């Protein structure tokens, strides 16, 4: 059995708890309606994509190695904040209620803006000069 670093698991847990709490707080602001754009899920997914792009690039290319930053911020915080599965459930609900155009737009825009957010964050991190 592999030897686990429980401090790394604790970092994932702590980051995941913060991300999930942020997502739950934002989701509580809107009542789900398959006839409307699901702004809470859309927002956390695009913001989370930007953050994971930022954290991944910054941690891998700009900061000294740390065994806890990436599990805390990437896997934990961003993993707890974002929710691809909820996006899928919302899309199916739109389809089941006959909102095919909204479902297609939501899927395409969510994935496209998520990819653009990761790319933008990566570009921004790489443009910032390291101060010494």
From Swiss-Prot:
One GO molecular-function entry: fluoride transmembrane transporter activity
Bilayer-spanning residue ranges: 11-31, 37-57, 70-92, 105-125
GO terms (BP aspect): cellular detoxification of fluoride; fluoride transmembrane transport
Superkingdom of the source species: Bacteria
Sites where the protein binds Na(+): 79, 82
Membrane disposition: Multi-pass membrane protein
Location within or outside the cell: Cell membrane
Activity control, per UniProt: Na(+) is not transported, but it plays an essential structural role and its presence is essential for fluoride channel function.
Reactions catalysed: fluoride(in) = fluoride(out)
GO cellular component: plasma membrane
Listed Pfam families: CRCB
Keywords recorded for this protein, A-Z: Cell membrane, Ion channel, Ion transport, Membrane, Metal-binding, Sodium, Transmembrane, Transmembrane helix, Transport
Record's function text: Fluoride-specific ion channel. Important for reducing fluoride concentration in the cell, thus reducing its toxicity.
HAMAP family assigned to the protein according to its UniProt record, in alphabetical order: FluC
Family indicated by similarity: Belongs to the fluoride channel Fluc/FEX (TC 1.A.43) family.
Record's protein name: Fluoride-specific ion channel FluC 1
Lineage: Bacteria, Bacillati, Actinomycetota, Actinomycetes, Mycobacteriales
Gene: fluC1
